[in-house]
Amino acid sequence: MKKLLFFILIPFLGIAQDFTANGINYTITSRTAPFTISVTDNPNFTGAAEIPETVAYNGNRYIVTAITRGAFMHCNNLTSVTIPNSVTTIRENAFADCPDLTSVTIPNSVTSIGDRAFSGCTGLISVTIPNSVTDIENGAFAGCSGLTSVTIPNSVTTIRENAFADCSGLTSVTIPNSVTSIGDYVFGGCSGLTSVTIPNSATTIGDGAFQDCSGLTSVTIPNSVTTIGNFAFERCSGLTSVTIPNS
């Protein structure tokens, strides 16, 4: 029984809260120079979260480098987030299901946005992904039904499964020339999407990538594409014109 208890406790040690500053909880990730911390669980946080680059604690100044898994998940009254230039990683579910979140600033220091990081943020209207990000992970912005505009930089090479699925407010998307792979169901359920630009760099369009995009009227698939997945354009009831390349 003691052994079982030991293994149950281990997962919780990684998300322990070490201290709170200005209403935000942090966990220490390095106690030696350079001193670093991550933003950890903040249940029931309300209002605007302004995360600083550094935080003083016990005589040391700590650099904020990451926002941990589920840090603000289900914070129904979180309205905006400012992420500092010191942060490189936003982990999975970090801001998932925050319906009142309308504004987020993601700095150029961020290289990784985790799975479902902003999924279910129905109040989010626009997102600019910085040019430091190379992959948009699984379901990163899925279910953001209020999202009308997204800027994808030329640094992105892969858009993974469900990244923008069910973003029903999204009307137009330009996929940059750097992208080589459009994952499964990436824009599935984006019923408001009327136009999409697929770049000459893309070689693969995944299963169901544009499934249920009922507002889509035309699409041109470039010669670079060699694989179009199953159901890629299924139930696109408004689609009247498709150009498929010889490739």
Tell me what each language-model feature is.
Residues 2-3, 76:
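Context-gated lysine
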Residues 3-13:
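Sec-dependent N-terminal signal peptides
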Residues 8, 17, 37-39, 115, ...:
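Intrinsically disordered, low-complexity boundary segments flanking structured domains
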Residues 16-23:
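Boundary at the C-terminal end of the N-terminal hydrophobic targeting segment
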Residues 23, 45-66, 76-89, 99-112, ...:
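Structural signature of tandem-repeat unit edges
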Residues 25-30:
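Short amphipathic beta-strand and strand-loop transition segments with alternating hydrophobic
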Residues 31-47:
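Secondary-structure transition/turn motif
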Residues 68-71, 91-94, 114-119, 137-142, ...:
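Consensus positions within tandem repeat domains that build extended binding/scaffold surfaces
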